[in-house]
Curated annotation (Swiss-Prot):
Organism of provenance: Mycolicibacterium vanbaalenii (strain DSM 7251 / JCM 13017 / BCRC 16820 / KCTC 9966 / NRRL B-24157 / PYR-1)
GO cellular component: cytoplasm
Name listed for the protein in its UniProt record: Peptide chain release factor 2
Gene field: prfB
Localization per record: Cytoplasm
Functional summary from the UniProt entry: Peptide chain release factor 2 directs the termination of translation in response to the peptide chain termination codons UGA and UAA.
Amino acid sequence: MDPDRQADIAALDATLTTVERVIDVDGLRGRIEQLEKDASDPQLWDDQARAQKVTSDLSHAQGELRRIEELRGRLEDLPVLYELAAEEGGSDEVAEADAELTKLREDIEAMEVRTLLSGEYDEREALVTIRSGAGGVDAADWAEMLMRMYIRWAEQHKYPVEVFDTSYAEEAGIKSATFAVHAPYAYGNLSVEQGTHRLVRISPFDNQNRRQTSFADVEVLPVTETTDHIEIPEGDVRVDVYRSSGPGGQSVNTTDSAVRLTHIPTGIVVTCQNEKSQLQNKVSAMRVLQAKLLERKRLEERAEMDALKGDGGSSWGNQMRSYVLHPYQMVKDLRTEYEVGNPSAVLDGDIDGFLEAGIRWRNRKDDE
């Protein structure tokens, strides 16, 4: 094997060793063992919420360990591939080994991103809200396309998704939607998606086939836990009930099961209509309200720190990504410069490259 390839393999070994140390592989195995014991408890399913969390955490931990062990095995096999290629003496065999080296580098770098998720709430599940912006019916349709994109991403990773509320627009699409992604580190990954997403395309709703620019806002919050101590006095919340509605304003429930919570001190309003009963909707809406109050508290603390440091802080608002379907095809992140020329794949949930680039960009900004 030539010195350059040896150096590449040594560098990958050093990176993977760092990943194994940061993730704590031995600790991960111990956590899996404990979760397996918890999952085998016959009384676990008496508490549905806890049971779902245990099984989700177990699946995620097992998958993470499996990926690390697979990367280590492939890295150990790589020198053997080059030895076999040298014995065969054929260019095809060398090219095959080089291709595996390139792919392994990409996979280890992707795993390395996981070690960058060290923020206070990065390990949490994520609560995502999408709102249509300027652009009329096209913007409502665009908001629904974004919702589908994130749900497809979660499905590809086998992450459970729970939709709390969907407010449908009159003609097509949605005014807004709120859903949770139930997976460890979902917040750390998806938090870089927060901001305004811009779509440029030939409008399917325009009889003259004119190009239309549409906007939608994405908000990502960490799901609250009991340790957050977000206490909401009963008198601070006004509860309104109404009938759930579907596309075009059509009623989808004959009872007043949908719930609207208004937090009187802050004016924050949360709705939930996707559960079957009023009680379930109220519980879900309260979870969303707690997450929004936690985020408000975090933003206030961050503003105080920025004032002490003498700077204005960084803004995640405004346009952060552009999706162009016409006159050319390109999805480009305006912060990281990462771009992909296949919008169809991106809109079908292939956003890992954007997430990885965003996480690396955020960490560089934090270090500045």
